[in-house]
């Protein structure tokens, strides 16, 4: 299976509960079927997507807001690992900001940022010229997920599983 990114759209009250009782985050269940509109499985695209969205050369977030769409510096409990990382979170206000920014990005912009030779350290490694289509497909899902969660007034909790 490898390392996959999972994002959950949650009500702000649920996020507050997670921040006061970090065991609450363990009640989230990943949906790998794609049937839950409040859960998104980004498969192994997370590192490449983060890079295209303005992340650094390791595939993790930078100060660029769109690069924080999958992982970021806000964690529920740094010592509580869900799979490979702690649970990251974005408030409903941050979700709305990122949803707007993702909505402004085009496939052409992302294609211009795609440099497989510069992505050698980005999981899952071994990027080729053809992999851009794989990433663009997941970008479209990510953008739609953010639009939906923003419209619902949801926060987002994410982790690498």
What are these regions (language model features)?
Residues 1-137, 141-144:
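Acidic (Asp/Glu-rich) sequence patches and key acidic residues
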Residues 134-161:
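C-terminal or internal capping secondary-structure element at the end of a domain, subdomain, or sheet
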């Amino acid at each position: 299976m490898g390392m996959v990114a999972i994002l959950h759209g949650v009500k702000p009250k649920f996020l507050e509960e997670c921040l006061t009782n970090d065991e609450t985050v363990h009640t989230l269940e990943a949906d790998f079927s794609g049937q839950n509109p409040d859960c998104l499985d980004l498969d192994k695209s997370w590192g490449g997507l983060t890079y295209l969205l303005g992340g650094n050369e390791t595939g993790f977030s930078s100060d660029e807001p769109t690069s924080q769409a999958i992982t970021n510096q806000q964690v529920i409990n740094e010592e509580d690992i869900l799979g490979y990382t702690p649970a990251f979170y974005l408030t409903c206000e941050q979700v709305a900001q990122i949803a707007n920014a993702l909505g402004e990005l085009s496939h052409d912009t992302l294609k211009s940022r795609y440099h497989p030779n510069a992505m050698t350290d980005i999981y899952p490694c071994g990027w080729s010229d053809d992999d851009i289509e794989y990433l663009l497909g997941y970008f479209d899902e990510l953008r739609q997920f953010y639009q939906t969660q923003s419209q619902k007034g949801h926060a987002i909790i994410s982790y690498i599983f």
